[in-house]
Amino acid sequence: MADLKKAAGGRETPQGELRSEVVEDEGPRSPVAEEPGGSGSNSSETKLSPREEEELDPRIQEELEHLNQASEEINQVELQLDEARTTYRRILQESARKLNTQGSHLGSCIEKARPYYEARRLAKEAQQETQKAALRYERAVSMHNAAREMVFVAEQGVMADKNRLDPTWQEMLNHATCKVNEAEEERLRGEREHQRVTRLCQQAEARVQALQKTLRRAIGKSRPYFELKAQFSQILEEHKAKVTELEQQVAQAKTRYSVALRNLEQISEQIHARRRGLPPHPLGPRRSSPVGAEAGPEGIEDGDSGIEGAEGGGLEEGSSLGPGPGPDTDTLSLLSLRTVASDLQKCDSVEHLRGLSDHASLDGQELGAQSRGRRGSDIGVRGGRHQRSVSL
């Protein structure tokens, strides 16, 4: 009993012999069961084709990032803008409330002293305009002096050689003279403007001095009100400048957002245009036509040319008629026309002329014997075929 093994069910099986029940239990498993969860079919569906992978433009991701950044910046800056506007309105309301309270306590002295503080404001503005006019006048004087120096250099170059006149120095002299005239006009204009604003500033200062002497008592009593008003005015100007800056940032962010959207639209149009330009199906390799043969019609498939292409089309058309009694008259006429066209192409071929023997018969019997072996399959389908004779 050394050649027997003890089976799991108590049976003894000779060595080297398989148990039938084990083979039955371990039957062949289907390939679908080996793939967990049917991942084989899903992977082919979710995987992008090479054509789709080629159409993915990297500029899309870049423009989407710009779009997201601009959107986040717009949201953040708009929140800051709303907060700044709320703060500005709150300060404006508080300043108006405090000023009204202060004005009710002081009484009529505020209205009496108001011309004095208005004159001070105008005098301050006139003083600032005077400073700006002085800067413009100084700039015009500097330009005039530089232009005069250029004219002097050009005159020295022209007078260096008295025997001949250099056109380069002459052109430089003319240009320098024009600059001197323009600088002189600008200097005179700046001088007149400076004199005008200086007179206005002097008049404003004189008015301030006169009102200060006349309204000395009302000015002293209303000083707290106007000082508080000046403080609130400065605070409001700062918040107004902040609001204006935030509005400009929002406008710039919205401009970048619009540019990113426009770029995405252009990329999308380019992709659609490229898709419309591609063929719907990739064309396979085409076989070349025989030497001397013309290209077949568009209706014939790639690779079907000459006699084989025409006869192949005839066989397929004849086989599609089904197991009926036979093709009708129109079908036979079409097949005959295709056969004649293929024979004409064959006879026009240079290779065919080289293959013909010198003793070929004029009635085409030898040609018919050669082509009978290739056309034997469709003799039953197409009853009578025309024999075309070849004349050399």
From Swiss-Prot:
Q: Which residues form a coiled coil?
A: 59-140, 169-272
Q: Which residue ranges have biased composition labelled Basic and acidic residues? A: 18-28
Q: Which UniProt keywords apply?
A: Coiled coil, Guanine-nucleotide releasing factor, Phosphoprotein
Q: Which segments cross the bilayer? A: none
Q: Which residues lie in Basic residues bias regions?
A: 383-392
Q: Which InterPro entries match?
A: SH3BP5
Per the record, the domain of life is Eukaryota
Described purpose of this protein according to its UniProt entry: Functions as a guanine nucleotide exchange factor (GEF) for RAB11A.
Q: What is this protein called?
A: SH3 domain-binding protein 5-like
Query: Origin organism of this chain?
Result: Mus musculus
The coding gene here is Sh3bp5l
